[in-house]
């Protein structure tokens, strides 16, 4: 890259004059106060920068100085010389491309670059943006309103007569190449704050920018061509993206096959008012009067309602339902339990006792033949069933006095008896054999004093002992 070359100073000034800001207004005016007059100098060609690009106005050799493009694409001149507004012809394609490139580079440029001196600028120009040659339209440069501050201000390039001193700083913005972001709209007014960041349009909803930098929402010559590459609301943008998805209709062959099957099914199964439902045996429809049988809360064909064992038809016959299965009477009886007393099948209630099944009328006492349904009973050693009374009468111990069976008292379940001399006695039969005194097994006075196999009280037992002693003495 090449920088600006300057002529050696001819008239150096010993004094330094303050430099002011050069305001390019585009109108001729007095030369800036630098303490020395401007000297003619040869034409200087500046290297193109991302934010400031120099153009040679086509006005002829009488052009006063190098022109440069400031922020927002307005052609300006340095050294306070008037800007040639008509120098950039609307029909010039190259000038329009450079103007758009500089605007894109400056407004999309990176932020935070430090200000550099104009004599130390060395940058590579960014690649020109993609454009369409067929849709370029001349855009007249809008005049920049004067503002007290804001934006990059061009430096006053001094000639040989300018004293050597600190040059006015020039703010240079370098554009950073950003992929996927569209340039902002032209015509934005210059503000004092920092430039806005790059605009990233949302895919499918953002603005599509064409070579003329027109939005789809703005009516213009290039809007129609750009909108052709964007589908409707349901579609996506360009670049190999998806379009609106249209549901595919069913092939005619499949539709015809489906209609044919439906027609055949309707012909084989015509709707009828005599339809009763599906058969519980075969699962087919029961249609027609007299063709079905209702049983077990279901509908059966006449030929399907048969016995589950012998397969005999049960229409008009008695049948037995066991676990939702139908049985004829013979097959049902064969499956029943037999009574342990009469050996007949039990068709009604079953009375179970000691692991056997009985008819309620067959479960009786073997002595009195009374039914024992709900009555306590007992069995003997041969598994004969007895009621409690008959069992005690038959198997209870006998009293040695009266000879009767010793049985429990009414309302009692236990039998109370007195055993003495290996004999059993009722409580009321346990008396002294001499005087008839009621003996007791607990009292000492009324206790039993047996003598020679007799039950005697204490007094009677003593009298008998004395009597026997006297007899023995007399015999001696």
Swiss-Prot record:
Chain intervals for the UniProt region annotation (Interaction with MAGI1 and PTPN13): 469-476
Outcome of swapping residue 101 to A: Exclusively located in nucleus
Gene Ontology MF: a single term: nuclear thyroid hormone receptor binding
Matches recorded under PROSITE patterns: LIM_DOMAIN_1, LIM_DOMAIN_2
Residue numbers of Phosphoserine PTMs: 92, 142, 189, 249
List of residues that carry Asymmetric dimethylarginine: 25
Bias-annotated ranges (Low complexity): 152-167
InterPro entries attached to this UniProt entry: Znf_LIM
SUPFAM superfamilies in UniProt: Glucocorticoid receptor-like (DNA-binding domain) (SSF57716)
Keywords from the named record: Cell adhesion, Cell junction, Cytoplasm, Cytoskeleton, LIM domain, Metal-binding, Methylation, Nucleus, Phosphoprotein, Repeat, Transcription, Transcription regulation, Zinc
UniProt note on tissues of expression: Abundantly expressed in kidney, liver and lung. Lower levels in heart, placenta and pancreas. Expressed in colonic epithelial cells. Up-regulated in colonic tumors.
Subcellular locations according to the entry: Cytoplasm, Cytoskeleton; Cell junction, Focal adhesion; Nucleus; Cytoplasm
GO annotation, biological process: chordate embryonic development; focal adhesion assembly; positive regulation of cell migration; positive regulation of non-canonical NF-kappaB signal transduction; signal transduction
GO CC annotation terms, alphabetical: cytoplasm; cytoskeleton; cytosol; focal adhesion; nucleus; plasma membrane; stress fiber
Function: Relays signals from the cell surface to the nucleus to weaken adherens junction and promote actin cytoskeleton reorganization and cell invasiveness. Involved in lysophosphatidic acid-induced cell adhesion and migration. Acts as a transcriptional coactivator for NF-kappa-B and JUN, and mediates the transrepression of these transcription factors induced by glucocorticoid receptor.
Record text about domains: The LIM zinc-binding domains mediate interaction with LPAR2 and with S.typhimurium protein sseI.
Quaternary structure and partners: Specifically interacts with the ligand binding domain of the thyroid receptor (TR) in the presence of thyroid hormone. Interacts (via the third LIM domain and C-terminus) with PTPN13 (via the second PDZ domain). Interacts (via the second LIM domain or via the third LIM domain plus C-terminus) with PDLIM4 (via PDZ domain). Found in a complex with PTPN13 and PDLIM4. Interacts with SVIL isoform 2. Interacts with LPAR2 but not other LPA receptors. Interacts with PRKAA2. Interacts with MAGI1. Interacts with SCRIB. In case of infection, interacts with S.typhimurium protein sseI.
Family: Belongs to the zyxin/ajuba family.
UniProt-recorded name of the protein: Thyroid receptor-interacting protein 6
Source organism of the structure: Homo sapiens
Taxonomic lineage: Eukaryota, Metazoa, Chordata, Craniata, Vertebrata
Gene: TRIP6
């Amino acid at each position: 890259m090449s920088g600006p070359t300057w002529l050696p100073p001819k008239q150096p000034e010993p004094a330094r004059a303050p430099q002011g800001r050069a305001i390019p207004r585009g109108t001729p005016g007095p030369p800036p106060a630098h303490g020395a007059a401007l000297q003619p100098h040869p034409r200087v060609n500046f290297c193109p920068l991302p934010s400031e690009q120099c153009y040679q106005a086509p006005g002829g050799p009488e052009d006063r100085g190098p022109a440069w493009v400031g922020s927002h694409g307005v052609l300006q001149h340095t050294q306070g010389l008037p800007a040639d507004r008509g120098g950039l012809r609307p029909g010039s394609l190259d000038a329009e491309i450079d103007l758009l490139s500089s605007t894109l580079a400056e407004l999309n440029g990176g932020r935070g670059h430090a200000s550099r001196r104009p004599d130390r600028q060395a940058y590579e120009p960014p690649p020109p943006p993609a454009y369409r040659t067929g849709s370029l339209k001349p855009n007249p440069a809008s005049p920049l309103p004067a503002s007290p501050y804001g934006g990059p201000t061009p430096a006053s390039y001094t000639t040989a007569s300018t004293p050597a001193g600190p040059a006015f700083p020039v703010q240079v913005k370098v554009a950073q190449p950003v992929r996927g972001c569209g340039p902002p709209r032209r015509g934005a007014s210059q503000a004092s704050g920092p430039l806005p960041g790059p605009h990233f349009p949302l895919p499918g909803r953002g603005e599509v920018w064409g070579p003329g930098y027109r939005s789809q929402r703005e009516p213009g010559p290039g809007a129609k061509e750009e909108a052709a590459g964007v589908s409707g609301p349901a579609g996506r943008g360009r670049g190999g993206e998806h379009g609106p998805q249209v549901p595919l209709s069913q092939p005619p062959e499949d539709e015809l096959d489906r209609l044919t099957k439906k027609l055949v099914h309707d012909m084989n199964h015509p709707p009828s008012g005599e339809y009763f439902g599906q058969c519980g045996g075969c699962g087919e429809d029961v249609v027609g009067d007299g063709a079905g049988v209702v049983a077990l809360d279901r509908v059966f064909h006449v030929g399907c309602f048969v016995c589950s064992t012998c397969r005999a038809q049960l229409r008009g016959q008695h049948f037995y339902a066991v676990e939702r299965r139908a049985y004829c009477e013979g097959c049902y009886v064969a499956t029943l339990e037999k009574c342990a007393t009469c050996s007949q099948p039990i068709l009604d209630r079953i009375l179970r006792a000691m692991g056997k099944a009985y008819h309620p009328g067959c479960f009786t006492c073997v002595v009195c033949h009374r039914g024992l349904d709900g009555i306590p009973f007992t069995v003997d050693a041969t598994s004969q069933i007895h009621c409690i009374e008959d069992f005690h009468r038959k198997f209870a111990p006998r009293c040695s006095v009266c000879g009767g069976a010793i049985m429990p008292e009414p309302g009692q379940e236990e039998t109370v008896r007195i055993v003495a001399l290996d004999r059993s006695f009722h409580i009321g039969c346990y008396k002294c054999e001499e005087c008839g005194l009621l003996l007791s097994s607990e009292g000492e006075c009324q206790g039993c004093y047996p003598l020679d196999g007799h039950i005697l009280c204490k007094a009677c037992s003593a009298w008998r002992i004395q009597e026997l002693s006297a007899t023995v003495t007399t015999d001696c």
